[in-house]
Amino acid sequence: MKKIKTSALIGLGALGILFGRKMPGVQVIADEDRIARYSAEPVVCNGEACSFRYVTPAEGKPVDLLLVAVKATVLEQAIQDIAKFIGPDTVILSVLNGITSEEHIETAYPGRTLWSVAIGMDATRSGRTLVFNQAGKIQFGERDGAMTGRVQAVADYLNACGIANEPCSDILYKQWNKL
């Protein structure tokens, strides 16, 4: 797997802000109405303004890594909205709570999903403002536990971004353990 250079995220709630602010050049996928709201009231994290590049689903071009951070209630719409951002080598990470989002994403985009779970953060969001003491980490891996080149590429990227992470050979256990 090649080095991850380009990224996008969908969902600018607590986890989207928490991780997205550390991803250089990340594209935040949102519809035009949401982009207008985000632009009118910029995101602030621990007192610092965050600058994001917003793009509509129609403007998408394939990226190396796509982070899905939406609420479960809008996952199906998000799966449609990310279509143009998915290429043959795109890796998708979902940080939704629960154990089913990866299955939904994998059904739509076979062979592109790494299973993952976000743990240990204490982020609180009020409007466009996020406050946290502990950023937590992303645990992730192949569903079958294999330590593949794409697992290593994601770990390298997250490390370069300063996002705590843990590649796992037992990611299904880690997901269930969070419950």
What spans do the regions from the language model cover?
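Residues at the C-termini of beta-strands that transition into short coil/loop
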Residues: 30-32, 56-58, 96, 117-119, ...
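Internal alpha-helical scaffold of NAD(P)-dependent oxidoreductase catalytic cores
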Residues: 85, 108-111, 127-179
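Short, charged/polar "capping" segments at the starts of alpha-helices
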Residues: 34-39, 101-103, 148
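Flavin (primarily FAD) cofactor-binding/catalytic cores of flavoenzymes
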Residues: 30, 82, 150
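NAD(P)+-binding Rossmann beta1-loop-alpha1 motif at the extreme N-terminus of oxidoreductases
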Residues: 1-50
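Hydrophobic anchor at the start of a short beta-strand
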Residues: 7, 25-27, 92, 113, ...
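Nucleotide donor/acceptor-binding cores
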Residues: 4-6, 64, 136
